[in-house]
Amino acid sequence: MNTLHPDIDHARQFLELLDADPASFTFQTFAERTGSKEFPRILHGSLTQHADTLIKANLNGAGIFVMVNAGDQRGRKAENVRRVRAHYVDLDQCGIDPLFTAELPPHIVVESSPGKWHAYWLAAPETSPEEFPLVQKALAKRFSGDPAVNDPSRVMRLPGFYHQKKDGDPFMTLMQQGKEA
């Protein structure tokens, strides 16, 4: 019997913070748990439209991810990105304390797995996909984050779903802080 219960409302809250019109996202699933029969899949549309598919995939051992930036609904490559929603930093190797003393603290903080964090700053509407990597690299340097997280089509873990990469207990990825810009 499966006792995991992904939290769609939590996922929805996160997506609504990223975009006032959360009707159009690109979701990605990847097999995580050993023995999972799930395969990588890309889904375009709303969380409501794909909730059942994402829940089933998560319960079957897949990690659930979302392309943070707005795409054209045709793919998940840099050329598919149409609008920057947020800048973010992956703090899997360091703590989050420096975030809270920053000149501009993040709008959203997510615990992706125990003691590992993602921080998001909502982007100005005029931010172009071409300048995205420069800001990402500066954030990674400033906060000792992962410098490889700099492509505009990057997917990040979707809060409300379970992280199952390690063969231990599943961990629900949770938004620990969220506020509008």
Question: Which residues does each PLM region occupy?
Answer:
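Short, glycine- and small/hydrophobic-rich beta-strand elements in well-ordered beta-sheets
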Residues: 17, 103-111
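DNA replication initiation modules
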Residues: 66-103, 123-181
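DNA replication initiation on ssDNA origins
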Residues: 1-86, 96
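Conserved aromatic
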Residues: 5, 44, 113, 123-126
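Short, conserved phosphate-binding/catalytic loop or strand-edge motifs used
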Residues: 109-118, 156
